[in-house]
Amino acid sequence: MGRSEPLEITKTIRRHQLREMVPLADSTIYEMEQRGEFPRRFALSPRCIVWDLAEVQAWLIARRAKPVF
């Protein structure tokens, strides 16, 4: 297999920070993640789940650019 570029994550956010940025229900976010429509969460430890802040911000920018209808 070829070597891939290392992932660069500069900052992660926890669930409560995500809720402040994206006012959607947890179940909606989970379903969107499963469909590939929202950045995927990952575990830093078994009890610490985070999202990449840059990915969430990019998702918000893309959503803002889409027409509502």
Region roles according to the model:
Residues M1-R35, A54-A65:
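Polyanion-binding surface elements
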Residues R35-F42:
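Short, solvent-exposed alpha-helical "recognition" segments
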